[in-house]
Amino acid sequence: MRTGVIAKKVGMTRLFQEDGRHVPVTVLSLENCQVVSVRTAERDGYVALQLGAGEAKQKNVAKPQREHFAKAEVPLKMEVAEFRVADDALLDVGSTIAASHFVPGQYVDITGQTQGKGFQGAMKRWGFGGMRATHGVSISHRAHGSTGNRQDPGRVFKNKKMAGHMGDRQRTQQNLEVVRTDDERGLIFVKGSVPGSKNAWLLVRDAVKVSRHAEAPYPAGLKQAANSNDSAAADTPAEVAAVEATEGQEG
């Protein structure tokens, strides 16, 4: 079992397939998603990875959390979450997970906080059909109908569908297809809609009801650190121009 990731919902758009069909997708962004801590069976009683994502200001982070991030030698994180993993899927603290952790064609489960709608009536909240506009209906056009009957049972049953607060609940959408990934920009394109509003933090995991994709990297798809020697060896355009000018003067 691999780790999931913490992603930010950017918004929705569409992608065109090779045959011309367009697919509505949700764009998810990985903002420096790093391993902050490791949970082991010997010390904690279970095996998991604690990940952090985003960049928080120091004034918005409590001192114990600042010490926690400093111990891991990672920047201050805006969002932190734990993912249960297998023993052979543990990662080093400080490892950065890339968008290549997921591959096109695989299915994922996405957990988020749905958009809050405030206090809503029974028709909008539960999809009730309502009553007729005229012909025998008085002030009950959008009412939910019977609530507690009469003397028997003389009470309102639990979970009765009535008007009340709608939305702002944690929900998980299962078996969403990954259409495309952009490793350079850290973007994941998922088919369809996902819970939450724009800029909301989401938890993205491998689908539990579908086998893991054969091409999905195990234990994780990590972002490779840039090699300083390679970058130093590469000539900049200014250096190339200077060499060419020098060669012209020698001639």
UniProtKB/Swiss-Prot annotation:
PROSITE patterns: RIBOSOMAL_L3. GO terms for cellular component: cytosolic large ribosomal subunit. It comes from the Bacteria. Keywords: Methylation, Ribonucleoprotein, Ribosomal protein, RNA-binding, rRNA-binding. The keyword rRNA-binding applies. GO terms for biological process: translation. The modification N5-methylglutamine is found at residue 151. Methylated by PrmB. GO terms for molecular function: rRNA binding; structural constituent of ribosome. Residues 221-251 are annotated as: Disordered. Residues 225-251 have a biased composition (Low complexity). One of the primary rRNA binding proteins, it binds directly near the 3'-end of the 23S rRNA, where it nucleates assembly of the 50S subunit. Belongs to the universal ribosomal protein uL3 family. Part of the 50S ribosomal subunit. Forms a cluster with proteins L14 and L19. NCBIfam families: L3_bact (TIGR03625). This is Large ribosomal subunit protein uL3. It comes from Novosphingobium aromaticivorans (strain ATCC 700278 / DSM 12444 / CCUG 56034 / CIP 105152 / NBRC 16084 / F199). The gene is rplC.
